[in-house]
Amino acid sequence: MMRTIPEKDWKHMRSMKSRVLNEACARILADVEAIVQKRDGRNHETYLTLWNLLKTKDAEIASMFDNFKRSTALFKLAAWYRYGLVSKSELTSFTEETQSTLKAINETLR
């Protein structure tokens, strides 16, 4: 398994970062909206639910986007795929070497 992502794939991944982060945040905000709409007078319970959701989602966002550098890129890309932010067809735009490494990472994490 390779240790760093090829330069071509790193450039491609960096070009995707903003879109993928925006999509991840949009999904979180949709979850927030759904929780708030169902609060039915249970404001404190709703607040606690939101607090727990945002703590969990913040950790996910951090794992996918914090410390974003070439040496961590393969694990970030694997997380994008695992969380459904990058499709299988989008992964085909990466080199075979990167695709093979991503497959190995995701199989290990199952």
Model regions and ranges:
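Acidic, Ser/Pro/Thr-rich low-complexity regulatory regions
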Residues: 1-110
